[in-house]
Amino acid sequence: MRKLLLSCSKIFVLCSFLFGIFPDTYAAVPVQDSTRTDTTSSSLNEPLQKFQPLKLNVLYGEQTRDRLVQSIGYLDGKRLESSPVTSLSNAFAGHLSGLYTNQSNGAPRYGVTSLSLRGRSPLIVIDGVPRYNEVYSELSLNPEQIESITLLKDGLSTVMLGNRSMDGVLMITTRNKSVSSGSTVSFTAQGGIQEAIGMRKGLSSFDYASLYNEARANSGLSPAFSQTQLDAYRNGTDPFLYPNVDWQKTVLRDNAPQMRYTLNAGGNYTNVRYFLSLDYQNQSGLFREDDANSYGTNVDYSRYIFRSNIELNIDKNLTANLNLVGNIQDFIQPGSGYGNIFALLQATPSNATAVTNFRGTFGGTREYPNSPYAEAVGTGYIKNNLQAAAVNVGLTQKLGNLIEGSWVKALLSYSPSYEQRINRSKNYNAYNYPVTGDTNNVLRVSTISEQPNSTTVQGRFQQTYLELSTGLDRSWKNNDFSAIVLASYDNSQSNNTLNEIYQGISTRLSYSFDKRFNIEAAGAYSANNRFAPGNQADFYPGAGASWNLHNESFMQGNKFLNELKLRASYAKVGNADPGYYLWRQTYASGSAYIFGTAATGTSSIAQGALANPNRVVEKAKKFNLGLDLAFSKQRGWINVDYFNSSQYDMLQTRGSSSVILGSAYPLENIGKSRYSGVEINSGWSATAGKLRYSISGNISSVSSRVLFNDEPTQQFAYMARTGNPVNQIRGYVADGFFNPGNLTSPRLEGFTPTEGDVRYKDLNGDGIINVMDQTVIGNDKPLLYFGANLGLQIAGFDMNVLFQGVENRDILTIGNYQFPFNLNGQGQAFSYNLNRYTPATASTATLPRVTIQNEVNNYLTSSLYVQDASYIRLKNLEVGYTVNPKILPSSVIRGLRLFVNGQNLATFSKYKDADPENYMGLYPLQRVINGGLSIKL
């Protein structure tokens, strides 16, 4: 059944890609207005047949679709509102081609999604200001505050950022109005239930003890558990002396609530446009609590956001913008830390100790003094409070009375944040009662401590950003011309470090002839103060062109094609990663030296890692080639992009340097690599009677190659990293297990194999397994990631479905969660560990024999532990109903919509041991079922 569902999901994704809508390069917008006219309606409550060219946001300006040369992805903010997420980045998956997402942690506040754009982590720009701190990006926005997401992919679209242009840009534009004219107020209330997904299942006490005895026998030791004890574990006759604790069920709740309330007000008048938003959300954690405590110990995350965006026409030529945002966050967790508790859940076996003893005290042993339950409810709590604000002030002056189409702009932004931690953590009493039941021989394994009440500063951050620009926009006959010259100054300071300053001058020139030919050139000269003098500044140029073939005379008779455009761009871009003044040699306290006959040590100062005064900005040469196609009255379209990024001056430590120096070598600009790939979007929208429908698909591929990394000359070609993918998994190639028929096969140096141990391929044929037999063991195919969306609307009902997935993704599953009894002979074991080698399971075993001692041979990094973590996920589903306005009291309520949505609803993957994204045993991802209503007043 699972294979059938997986096949059906792949078919749906393929069909969506072939016949989809809403490609992220273009956005379908109604002719009458490109803003949302009804905050209570779904994105399908808009005309789907008639469209006009959309002005897309580009860096420091706008550009019409027909003049576009750059490679840009676009997403209407409305598309994110169906995702019941508490961190904005968790809603991006599957929407934008070229943007790879991975969420490896599901914890409230900290469960943000990592983003990768064509192999690099993109810079976040919000309302024109670069943001480096998640406080001002993922955690400072909710979907209802967003007007659009713009993804700047190629070098030409980002080159004006100079030494910050290499990684691409995810540009967020917040709303400045809610309606096409007049004013409106809307309120949305929603609440949902979270439940953990993809957690490993630990063994029962009986299975654990049986496997433990087997491991001791394989290590030549006597059994640890007698048959009487095994029977007691299986029968559960004495839960105190022979516990069988499901720690996950004991520590974690089946589900946890989350809620969000949003009040928005907006207006659009001749001289003023505004958007005001007040948002509160709360996300509870999964931990159980003890009613005996007078305080909460569960994870709890609350966030308050206030946003005010105002645009004012002071006169016909002068416009002012004022954006204010305030962000307050409270985060509570158990005193021992939520991460520590989940680590214990992965490491504590079911028979380690009783949850509580028969006297009601916490249980514990010498081997397991800290039970997951005691750590969750008995260690007090820690509370973090964060307060952040940002203010943007902008002025735009038109200078048409001097030079037609000219203007000047100024933007000033100031953003401070402050976080403090209140520590009320403590220890607890835990006791071990011996298996004899002798209550007079009780061992205390943990002792209670006083509960402090201390406050410490966790972090300070402030950013000042200043931007001055002037430009010209002119059109005459068949010519369109625009130009901009811009100077920027970005000063940020974190905690007690010295300020980091980015500053530069940039320009862009765009010319269009006869709506057929478009050319664009841009450049930036930028600097960073943390490089050595002489290496702080560099110049970054870029250029591109596009050709609208559908406007050529030989295409005029074609009524089917509405758009056919070729695009190409090339740019030199940079990535400033200066570190903290690493060009300056540092010294620190060293070991004590003894002089003379006295045994008194004298303090010393030692040289730190070698400095590199020649360190410069990492760079890349980016090439992009694109095709844009729209057809059938713009009901369908296809966009294709090919990119190639040749990176050089990449920072790395030399691999060919001698290790006898006695000091760490510095990072140097010697690395070279290449990223390339293809991105395809397709779309279709139409109506069938009263049914409106849309279907979309996007798929992206990215591959990488190491071109140079200064590795030592390898004796065998298969050992080289050069020519293989960047960050490729390397290790030994597993070749099954040793059995009585192959015990003389090549083995690890100094190791005598036993039946059931891992056998490795002797790649160089010398009869010995050593470092000379290590090679690439991961998948070297291009990484594929994709999204597919289906939208339906009829008779007030609407539905949106989003699938998202990844192919050709390998993970390395090594660590304490993979290897049983790997903590000095202790530790948890999981259901998949039962697939170990025994003489009876020799033909089906997927893991080596179990042992108590750390058998190095069996736990080496090898292909045995490389898993295919490709997956397809039903990422989001929403069903809504918009009440007919005719039956509403129009004097009070102008619109009402009810909705139910869900996130992470189903996952289909070959990897069964855990969630394919969150496989390291961290706070689990959650399936969310959410419902609510939106009211427009």
What residues fall within each predicted segment?
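Short, solvent-exposed beta-strand-terminating loops
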Residues: 194-198, 419-429
